[in-house]
Design a protein with these regions (language model features):
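Positively charged n-region of N-terminal signal peptides that target proteins for export
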Residues: 1-4
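Bacterial N-terminal signal peptides
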Residues: 7-16
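Low-complexity, acidic/polar, glycine-enriched regions of mature
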Residues: 19-202
């Protein structure tokens, strides 16, 4: 009995030591599902209207640490050619050298540098935004919509995570100054992201 007790205690001690030294689960990669994500920005046009445009093409991923969201990160690339206002002539103007200059700067990128958890579902995501060849730190006010399993029976089943975020940027900070201030310098941005572990589909 004494030998059994000592063996049990030794095993328990070793197990506790191993658990204490074990590394926490690493963040897992979730690919952005462009078909269910969107980035919309708007501006004031000479005081008369407030048009919007969107980016239809979104590439990137979320490194999601479900145990500690502050250890998560996000990386997004937007091909400027995917910009869509619904008006072909306006699309052409916004992609021209007067604005985004898509030929010279074909992508917009965002890479997070810090994630802070705010309350139950809130996040403050700080990162490097590169537009028009200029990189600036911006902060997104974000919220977690849902983390769980996305399933369409018989079609697919995959771990998924959804987020919404907003921010306001000054386009002049990125060297895009055409028509400022008649066309607003401050640009509100709304983001919704759906990210999935697509390799898990079945």
């Amino acid at each position: 009995m004494r030998r059994l007790t000592l063996t049990t205690l030794l095993f328990a001690s070793l197990s506790a030591f191993a658990a204490a030294g074990a590394k926490p689960p690493a963040a897992e990669k979730y690919d952005i599902d462009a078909s269910h994500s969107g980035i919309v920005f708007g501006w004031n046009h000479f005081g008369f209207s407030n048009p919007n445009a969107r980016f239809d093409k979104i590439e990137g991923s979320v490194q999601l640490d479900k145990g500690d969201l502050s250890k998560s990160s996000v990386s997004v690339t937007l091909p400027v050619e995917g910009l869509d206002t619904g008006v072909a002539k306006l699309d052409e103007m916004l992609k021209s050298p007067d604005f985004f200059d898509a030929a010279k700067y074909p992508t917009i990128t965002f890479k997070s540098t810090k994630v802070e958890k705010i309350g139950e579902n809130g996040l403050k995501v700080t990162g490097e935004l590169t537009v028009h060849g200029v990189t600036k730190l911006v902060t997104l006010d974000a919220k977690v919509n849902k983390i769980g399993i996305f399933e369409i029976p018989g079609v697919m089943k995959a771990p998924a995570a959804g987020f919404d975020a907003t921010t306001v940027i000054k386009r002049s900070d990125f060297g895009v100054t055409k028509f400022v201030p008649a066309v607003s310098d401050e640009i509100p941005v709304r983001i919704t992201l759906d990210a999935k572990q697509m390799q898990a589909k079945s």
